[in-house]
Amino acid sequence: VNPSGRLPVSFPVSAAQLPRPKLDGDPAAPESLDPSKGQPPFDVHYIEGAEVGYRWYEKTAAKPQFAFGYGLSYTRFTYGGLKVSGGTSLSATFTVTNSGKRSGIETPQLYVAGEGRTRRLVGFARVSLKPGERRTITLKADPRVLATFDGAAHRWRPARGRYAVTVGPAASEAALTGASAIR
């Protein structure tokens, strides 16, 4: 049996990599946060906004101990042939090859980043491959995931512009990179 699970979270090297190694307003260690022991309530302000998890590590250029999407395998996979298509939506077509000696399952992930923004997971696939087998994969970004909210118009709008595209087995592993635009 070949392992194929992937981490749904990122693990830091140390607490110093976290957005908030110590909670503001907490005068004591975290284990004393039991309200029955008289710990007064306090507010926590989440200044990182939506930049949490793998996005926090990218924004701060920190390398986690184990990134979102990390997994183990007894075989190896190689990626190639990236073709990115833009227009009214965004998609990436590429190949994944089992270059090892055992059958295995790979989970390629598609990340995109608009200009001045951090990467965001917009698609993934789970692919079972025998040794030497190659498969062509196409992942499409849901346009709703790339939309931005126009507060003045009170509606979502397509996020036009240029996008950097990354494909790989985990958030911290870019096997392929490209770019395209949404108009």
Identify the residue ranges that each predicted region occupies.
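Intrinsically disordered, low-complexity Pro/Gly/Ser/Thr-rich segments with frequent PxxP/GP/PP motifs
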Residues: 117-151
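Intrinsic-disorder/low-complexity, polar/charged segments enriched in Ser/Thr/Lys/Arg/Asp/Glu/Gln
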Residues: 89-93, 134-138, 175-177
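Solvent-exposed residues in well-ordered beta-strands and their adjoining turns
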Residues: 97-99, 113, 140-144
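Secreted, periplasmic, or luminal enzymes acting at the cell surface/secretory milieu
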Residues: 1-91, 96-105, 111, 160, ...
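Terminal connector regions
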Residues: 142-183
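Composition- and surface-driven signal marking solvent-exposed, interaction-prone regions
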Residues: 106-111, 119-125, 151-158, 178-179
